[in-house]
């Protein structure tokens, strides 16, 4: 899980989700998991 100021989808499978006002990216590739700071 990377915590970043700006999250961007890395590949086609990355999905942007908003949970409790926090932008998250989930993906099959666990290295692509991100959360906005």
Curated annotation (Swiss-Prot):
Keywords noted in UniProt: Ribonucleoprotein, Ribosomal protein
InterPro entries, A to Z = Ribosomal_bL36, Ribosomal_bL36_sp
Q: Which GO terms describe its biological process?
A: translation
- GO cellular component annotations, sorted alphabetically? cytoplasm; ribonucleoprotein complex; ribosome
In terms of superkingdom, the source organism counts as: Bacteria
Could you cite one Gene Ontology molecular function of this protein? Answer: structural constituent of ribosome
Q: Name one Pfam family in it.
A: Ribosomal_L36
Q: Which HAMAP family match?
A: Ribosomal_bL36 (MF_00251)
- Family, per entry: Belongs to the bacterial ribosomal protein bL36 family.
| UniProt-recorded name of the protein | Large ribosomal subunit protein bL36
- Please report the organism this UniProt entry assigns to the protein: Borreliella afzelii (strain PKo)
